[in-house]
Amino acid sequence: MTPRLPQPAQARIPHLEILDDSPDGARIVELYAGAVGSGRTRTLRLLGRKHAARIIHTLLGYEVQSSYRRIQCPDLVTARYLRLFSELGFRSIRLPYDPTVTARVIPELEAAVENLESRVRALFPRDPRLGAYVLRRVYAILRRRIRALPA
């Protein structure tokens, strides 16, 4: 095993500027605010850390599994909504009671998150670990912005 040489001093990565330069960051916050601000909502608790989530089809509907936690969902649209916010690392989210609101907003949310991910990863093509680190920091800023929305 070769010893690691000390890295030269590098400039700080401007996470906030990366998020602000992307139109998708503001779009995610705007879509979430539009979805939860348009009617009655309920609050669901999620895992609270960024973790890969998957949707499981069961006899009674769907479940979103993130790490050890499983959340029952009545339909696929709700499951996609919960999976997206579980993967972003939210502790809790507001879910509209009206599934048509969720169905209208989820494709745009998924596309915005995908665009944001590809944009950040394109900034660091030679170092995927650094890209993943920057993406985690950008998600943390997004979580703070969404938490700051009025209830």
Descriptions of predicted regions:
Residues R40-R69:
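Short aromatic-glycine-(Arg/Gly/Cys) micro-motifs in beta-strand/loop hairpins
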Residues L5, T58, I71, Y81-L84, ...:
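Positively charged, low-complexity intrinsically disordered regions
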Residues T2-R45, L142-R144:
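Negatively charged, low-complexity tracts enriched in Asp/Glu with abundant Ser/Thr
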Residues R40, Q65-S67, Q72-R94:
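A short, charged, amphipathic alpha-helix used as a generic interaction element across diverse proteins
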Residues L88-P150:
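Mixed-charge (acidic/basic) macromolecular-recognition segments
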